Design a protein with these regions (language model features):
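Sec/Tat signal peptide C-region and signal peptidase I cleavage site
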Residues: 18-22
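N-terminal segment of the mature folded domain
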Residues: 23-151
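Short beta-strand->loop
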Residues: 29-31, 103-114, 123-125, 135, 143-169, 183-187, 221-238, 246-250, ...
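Ligand-binding pocket segment of bilobal, Venus flytrap-like solute-binding proteins
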Residues: 169-235
Length: 257
């Protein structure tokens, strides 16, 4: 099953769990590079929903850095559903906002994780800097584009992938920390989210390599001039597991639970 089909099945179960919807509008607060996924998803879900005899619903989307999005929900953004980049961001909705139960991750199948992804490198045509693996990212003169891990879930996956590579290769946390510090010294700009970093790299032509979600890298290639970019798969990356949750406190108040 493709990532998109699996995401569709899992999030649909979140949206239709419990009593029938009492409102005609839902808000999905999501992380940065999922806009295109959920445009397709929303259309497919609505067709499925209407085929079961229900009235069509409107599904609104909000996108941004995962950590920033979690903060917005805690501060009052009325999300019915959150689909964020890391479980830790959704945990904050319980810890700081009491918007979801502590055991939210047990409420849906597969630990509320409908799909997985990974982190890859996106380089320019011909790979002029010869970037093949993580070690190439810390070389002098190589500009690395990655978002700010303080606001972006994808950036934290990037950080963890680099750390895991260095720790395995060099054998200690101290060496891993040193490696990651060297990598970030090669980052000229820290955008707040993954899509912002893609725009910096693709549209603004800044940097030699973009650390990207796999789907974001493929999208950049599909929407750019043929052959303008290439994907490089590093020798070691990370299994990213973006989870979903119903924001039960908000959905209950709005009658969408």
């Amino acid at each position: 099953m493709s990532i998109r089909r699996f995401a569709l099945a899992a999030l649909a179960s979140a949206l239709i769990a419990g009593p029938a919807l009492a409102a005609d509008t839902l808000l999905n607060v999501s992380y940065d590079p999922t806009r295109e996924l959920y445009v397709e998803f929303n259309d497919a879900f609505n067709k499925h929903w209407q085929a079961q005899g229900h009235e069509p619903i409107k599904i609104q989307q909000s996108h941004g850095g995962s950590g920033k999005q979690a903060r917005a929900v805690i501060d009052g953004l009325r999300a019915d559903v959150v689909t964020l980049a890391l479980a830790g961001d959704i945990d904050e909705l319980h810890r700081l906002g009491k918007l979801i139960p502590e055991d939210w991750q047990t409420r849906l199948p597969d630990a509320s994780t409908p799909y997985t992804s990974t982190i890859v490198f996106l380089v320019r045509k011909g790979n002029p800097k010869g970037i093949k693996d993580w070690d190439d990212l810390v070389k002098p003169g190589v500009e690395v584009i990655t978002p700010n891990p303080k606001t972006s879930g994808g950036a934290r996956w990037n950080f963890l992938a680099a750390w895991a590579y260095a720790q395995q290769k060099y054998g200690s946390e101290a060496k891993a920390q040193e490696f990651v510090q060297k990598l970030y010294k090669n980052v000229p700009v820290l955008d707040t989210g993954a899509r912002g970093s893609t725009i910096t790299f693709v549209n603004n032509q800044i940097g030699d390599v973009l650390l990207a979600w796999e789907n974001e890298a493929h999208l950049a290639i599909a929407e750019s001039d043929r052959g303008a970019f290439e994907i490089v798969a590093p020798s070691r990356s990370i299994l990213a597991e973006p989870p979903v949750a119903v924001v039960e406190r908000v959905a209950s108040r709005r009658g969408t639970l």
